[in-house]
């Protein structure tokens, strides 16, 4: 690709018109839909430079409704058409809202009251299966092929004709997402990490690590957060809190494969943290016990209603990942249905050297 920037979005939350998506389904006299705002941002930022790709870190829908996935598919196709992107230029991972996160109240609102005495656990399990089927149908529509069994994905970009960027999209929603049972909790699993590393060419079939070539940027993208995002969580009796259950396993995987950046959404809050990690922290650094520095960056939400945004920063964001300089730059731009994109980023994060 001649282009040297990738647009990153997250937590768009398309719905059936009764959910929490903040933008109109199509442009009108007063407001612009999300695809128009994203294309407008890309055109303003490009300065003659082509957009090279689109990354979405989960929660494309509000409650995994068919209508939400249809709007998500239309959105991706509209943006792709306007920016001359192909399916090979797009990478996504599912969020917990895409694969069946639902409470009893939400279930009855969406599906209606059950006419039988079917246990709630069975209803929730069936809803989860149906949600996953909706996601797979959406994936096939966008990419013209079936997804991997674990819903992971990988892409390798050659930007500006010489910069190699490898992006591994992980499914952090392996566990069934049911209220009062793994509500919002992330889980990736050892098998998925091994499969992705091998598919990306980071590890051979014997489990031996393949050295990262000089100048290559490696990115892992998932939906759930790995470190604390909110300053404090409200305590509720018997409440399940949102965590990634195998976060340490993923962080060790990042060190082993020298991944430079982890991108995620989920909490609708933008943040950045730089971590220096050793595989065995109580032992000296060595070839078999390497030290690695990487950044974890959270985008927030690109399309959810203001009622679901943090009070401290009640805005929707898109991030431009700009690879044109010596260091990767993450530039966060506000998206607004009534006003066009600003020329200047609200936040700018300098990447690693």
PLM regions: where:
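His/acidic metal-ligating clusters that form di-metal
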Residues: 43-50, 160-169, 178-281
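Short, flexible/disordered intra-domain loops and linkers
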Residues: 18-28, 105-111, 182, 230-243, ...
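Active-site environment of divalent metal-dependent phosphoester hydrolases
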Residues: 15-17, 61-64, 94-107, 176-178, ...
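Active-site neighborhood of phospho(di)ester-bond hydrolases with catalytic His/Asp-centered motifs
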Residues: 8-10, 52-59, 85-96, 219-223, ...
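Extended active-site neighborhood of metal-dependent phosphoesterases/phosphodiesterases
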Residues: 73-199
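N-terminal active-site segment of His-dependent metallophosphoesterases
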Residues: 1-71, 75, 85-88, 101
